[in-house]
Amino acid sequence: LTTLLPRPRLQQFARDWLAEDAPWLDIAGWAASRRNQGGQEEAVLLCKSAGVLAGGPFFQAVCEEAGCTVQWEHRDGEWLEPVTRVATVKGRVNDLLLAERPALNALSRISGVATLAREASRKAKATGWPGLVTGTRKTTPGFRLPEKYGLLVGGAGTHRYGTTDLVMLKDNHVWAMGGVKEALDGVRALAGKTLKVEVECRSLEEALDAAAAGADIVMLDNLPPENMVRKTVKLMGPDASLTISSN
């Protein structure tokens, strides 16, 4: 999965995070480096909580941008138990201290997403459900790619990365355009036949209207799952896929 991440994008994340944390000066790091006389030191990355390791490329990008090197002992996707030695980071003291917090913030958050994704996928599979657990666009602003990467490492799907790779008509879109059919006609005129269109539905009637109007995907939003899903699948027919959204 690491090959999915373009190197220029990783470098941009690293630069932004480092600039956010140390926009001008790192006085404490500078003082520590003076005491150390600029010599090379070694830091050890430890896993202190059980979970899925994820975010290695982002961690490494931050370290490299700060002038450090990383030697990994475990890879993204592995389940780690505490206390596990994950990696060794080498560099000057001030470089290690500069990279430490942004690199750890990214790694811990992405690993948390991956861990929850794996647990949710495991629970869904245990019920015999054949579908795929996916994450939505409800991501942290500016952190979507890392969080989507965490979902993939954890074994979940990403649903969509933004508004351009899948057209999704939510209730406000449908309301603004006067109805499900009108909304579908409107987006089809712009998207053509190359992009799939998903319609968010809050009732059985809306779901059937969306399927009849040509929606590729019908999303049931916060509906009672058991009987509603079965009934919708039976009535909807084979031409549209079904997704389920829940808080």
PLM ranges: what are they?
Residues 1-209, 213, 217, 230, ...:
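Acidic/glycine-rich phosphate/pyrophosphate-binding loops and surrounding catalytic core
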Residues 222:
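Short secondary-structure boundary segments
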Residues 239:
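Conserved phosphotransfer cores of two-component systems
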